[in-house]
Amino acid sequence: LAPKDPREAQVLDLLKKEVARLTRLVESLAHLRPGRREAFALEDLWLRLSALMQDRLRGRRVEVALGHRVEADPEALLQILLNLLDNALKYGQDPIRLLSRVRGGRVYLEVRDRGAPLPDYEGLFQPGRRGGEGSGQGLGLYLVRRLAQGLGGGAYALREGEENVFGVWLPVD
């Protein structure tokens, strides 16, 4: 489908973006059931994530420290990080930090940003709730929590110092 004028090109671009968004939503819903588990390095997940979000990441400062291995469904974990990073890019301020750490039999994956403090972090995990002037459906963090629970873990959000922290934890096998 070739646009005939700039307005048509704009509409076509908008339609493509909406189809991509709806595709991601359907994929998120499909991943609510745990899939295959495999061991992999979180750095490998970052390579996939950065390729998917290449345009959104351009011009942004994202610091990545994912030095751990996990055993989980890689597609579900990719969707979790995609949702968390997408929110940080929409609502947060640079630098955005994506990191992992292990503590107490759990691996934690966090996306941290320097956005404004939020009034109700826990409420953001409810379906239909959005932070700020969001344009989405308010399902991103709800799906993050459900996916994390499907992997045997959980999701959380809090303010730590000058940063908003959105993360998930998974059990270490």
Model-derived segments and spans:
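Short alpha-helical segment of the dimerization/phosphotransfer core of two-component systems
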Residues: 14-21
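Conserved micro-motifs of the catalytic ATP-binding
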Residues: 31-38, 69-72
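Short helix-loop "hinge" at the ATP-lid/N-box region of the Bergerat-fold HATPase_c
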Residues: 88-89
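Short beta-strand/loop element within the Bergerat-fold HATPase_c
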Residues: 95-105
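Short conserved segment of the HATPase_c
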Residues: 118-129
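Glycine-rich phosphate-binding loop
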Residues: 135-143
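Glycine-rich ATP-binding loops of the HATPase_c
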Residues: 152-159
